[in-house]
């Protein structure tokens, strides 16, 4: 019985290395396949990350372009409205000049007449509306400023120093700080 057991054991020990070798070979093959799969997965992951990065950069550029176009359109729209207001204001200046002339003539004839008072109220209302929309008259104090005044003649004046404004011949206007029309003035020249 002992011999039989030894034979059986010998028989198993001879088979074990062969099956063990097959199992090891199979495991090595699986390990290689797993390593190849891991490498392929790494390559796929790298490729995916690269493509994702490219697409993300494209998205950021397109988004930035979109925002720039949006801002430019808003600015263009705003400028178009500004230009429209400025154009209307320029078209109104002769009407304002006519009302000022009519008021001046009416006041010279009779300061207390209904016409004079009506023209005065109309001018006040007109200036209120213009001011609400950023249109205002240019002040013509004593100092001459070539940015706001246009000297169209020089006159002798005992009351004013050289270069000072003597008389406003036509009112000037500005729109949101920008000159629409300079004030036409005469300045003192006492040489």
Swiss-Prot record:
Ranges of biased composition (kind: Basic and acidic residues): 1-19
Name under which the protein is recorded: Protein GrpE
Compartments where found: Cytoplasm
One example GO MF annotation: protein-folding chaperone binding
Gene encoding the protein: grpE
Chain segments carrying region Disordered: 1-44
PANTHER family, A to Z: GRPE PROTEIN (PTHR21237), GRPE PROTEIN HOMOLOG, MITOCHONDRIAL (PTHR21237:SF23)
Family membership noted in the UniProt record: Belongs to the GrpE family.
Entry keywords, A to Z: Chaperone, Cytoplasm, Stress response
Described purpose of this protein according to its UniProt entry: Participates actively in the response to hyperosmotic and heat shock by preventing the aggregation of stress-denatured proteins, in association with DnaK and GrpE. It is the nucleotide exchange factor for DnaK and may function as a thermosensor. Unfolded proteins bind initially to DnaJ; upon interaction with the DnaJ-bound protein, DnaK hydrolyzes its bound ATP, resulting in the formation of a stable complex. GrpE releases ADP from DnaK; ATP binding to DnaK triggers the release of the substrate protein, thus completing the reaction cycle.
Annotated Pfam families: GrpE (PF01025)
Subunit structure as annotated in this protein's UniProt entry: Homodimer.
Classification via Gene3D superfamilies: 3.90.20.20, Head domain of nucleotide exchange factor GrpE (2.30.22.10)
Gene Ontology CC: one annotated term: cytosol
Top-level taxon of origin: Bacteria
A Gene Ontology BP annotation from the UniProt entry: protein folding
């Amino acid at each position: 019985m002992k011999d039989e057991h030894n034979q059986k054991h010998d028989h198993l020990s001879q088979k074990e290395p062969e099956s063990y070798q097959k199992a090891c070979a199979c495991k090595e093959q699986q390990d290689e396949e797993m390593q190849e799969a891991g490498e392929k997965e790494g390559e796929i992951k790298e490729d995916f990350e690269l493509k994702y990065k490219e697409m993300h950069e494209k998205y950021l550029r397109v988004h930035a372009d979109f925002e720039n176009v949006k801002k430019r359109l808003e600015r263009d729209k705003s400028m178009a409205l500004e230009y429209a207001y400025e154009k209307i204001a320029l078209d109104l200046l002769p009407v304002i000049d006519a009302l000022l002339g009519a008021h001046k003539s009416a006041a010279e004839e009779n300061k207390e007449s209904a016409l004079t008072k009506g023209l005065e109220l109309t001018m006040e209302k007109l200036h209120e509306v213009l001011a609400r929309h950023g249109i205002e008259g240019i002040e013509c104090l004593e100092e001459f400023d070539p940015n706001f005044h246009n000297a169209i003649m020089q006159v002798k004046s005992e009351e004013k120093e050289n270069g000072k404004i003597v008389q406003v011949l036509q009112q000037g206007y500005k729109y949101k700080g920008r000159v629409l029309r300079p004030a036409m003035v005469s300045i003192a020249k006492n040489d």
